Amino acid sequence: MFRTATLLAFTMAAMVFGQQVGTNTARSHPALTSQKCTKSGGCSNLNTKIVLDANWRWLHSTSGYTNCYTGNQWDATLCPDGKTCAANCALDGADYTGTYGITASGSSLKLQFVTGSNVGSRVYLMADDTHYQMFQLLNQEFTFDVDMSNLPCGLNGALYLSAMDADGGMAKYPTNKAGAKYGTGYCDSQCPRDIKFINGEANVEGWNATSANAGTGNYGTCCTEMDIWEANNDAAAYTPHPCTTNAQTRCSGSDCTRDTGLCDADGCDFNSFRMGDQTFLGKGLTVDTSKPFTVVTQFITNDGTSAGTLTEIRRLYVQNGKVIQNSSVKIPGIDPVNSITDNFCSQQKTAFGDTNYFAQHGGLKQVGEALRTGMVLALSIWDDYAANMLWLDSNYPTNKDPSTPGVARGTCATTSGVPAQIEAQSPNAYVVFSNIKFGDLNTTYTGTVSSSSVSSSHSSTSTSSSHSSSSTPPTQPTGVTVPQWGQCGGIGYTGSTTCASPYTCHVLNPYYSQCY
């Protein structure tokens, strides 16, 4: 949330974006290995790569090296209107490490906060040189390791899914000649208006400077977003954001408005601190952010298949070889659950006095449709010119009593996160994402589940029986056959171990066996 107009890049005297292809700097896509995992075949490597978002690239005239955009203004001659600008201006390649502080090695990606005059970055995972890797995650899970020990208050090391086009919009918009190869086609639930090119045209009409290096135009670019991870070493949240239109859509006027427009910009977040457990995640806490750990997110459907409807999003962690169940809610008026469901979101909005825009935009079902079609993985590091990241790690809004439910989100001071200060004081901050895996439930992680971490706090509104190894689903009485997708075994399980015909009991891990 609040991602609009916060990602800044200062390179070659311009923050740049374009739709033609330049030749001054060679185009490259650093390799970043990921893995696809199945119950039958285990995990196998994918030859995935990364590409820098086009908003960071140098934009110059196709006939030379005149900047099409300098400081916070478009060149009036090259860019008198959106279509002319798209024809006149070209994107170039990128020096990932030297200019942008982006280093990929094996399955590990390091994003440096400040490198020279560049601040922040955003990259996408690619399946090949011309297409983004598309993630279809219904009845699947997504796992990664993160080291955010050097990510202080006010910064956000984000890993999230966006309903972008696989080719970056080339097929839809013929004036876009660069495509995914150059990181085009961005959209999210904030309907950002600071994106330089949308739908193959420059966003020059109505352009107004908002800072020394950025501005906003008449248009925004909207799509459903799934924030798997927004965090620093003081706070973390995962948040689904539905839009009434899942595919990338250009907005104008009231359609771009937060929450009442095409998208639910605030979303339905699960931040452990905000949900009442202030000892769960942080430096030296249950999930110790001073050390690396694994984050697992499971997308549960109503029928336990990829054809079903998204009804629940679960979270668990693995650190020091131990599986850690997500924290449970400790807020009056909200059931003590530890996952996101439509019921949780409804109760949360009521308890916090917020309008339920999440439900108005279609809730989990709508997010699930984007996950069914396929979403693009974005990884970024950024600071927040709109709200100083207080919505993530401090008290927000700052004019409300911190004791009011939903206001306190972390321990960072309300004076923290000012971009000018954090860029000067913490230029060497960074985040490392590694070991990206996705696939069948309970196949992308390993770890020991202690009895104290086993919880039955998943929402009862989910009708799925594909449960995480760290949860305790209802057991079947002994002597009763277990239906397809039901639990049939595991440490601590006391129910029936006989599956209904023609299904058999399969061991998924020591703590959970399932009929299928």
UniProtKB/Swiss-Prot annotation:
Location(s) in or outside the cell: Secreted
Disulphides: C488-C505, C499-C515
BP term (GO), one: cellulose catabolic process
Active site residues per record: E225 (nucleophile), E230 (proton donor)
InterPro entries: CBD_sf (IPR035971), Cellulose-bd_dom_fun (IPR000254), ConA-like_dom_sf (IPR013320), Glyco_hydro_7 (IPR001722), Glyco_hydro_7_sf (IPR037019)
Single GO MF annotation: cellulose binding
Record's function text: The biological conversion of cellulose to glucose generally requires three types of hydrolytic enzymes: (1) Endoglucanases which cut internal beta-1,4-glucosidic bonds; (2) Exocellobiohydrolases that cut the disaccharide cellobiose from the non-reducing end of the cellulose polymer chain; (3) Beta-1,4-glucosidases which hydrolyze the cellobiose and other short cello-oligosaccharides to glucose.
Protein name per UniProt: Exoglucanase 1
Originating organism: Phanerodontia chrysosporium (White-rot fungus)
Lineage, opening ranks: Eukaryota, Fungi, Dikarya, Basidiomycota, Agaricomycotina
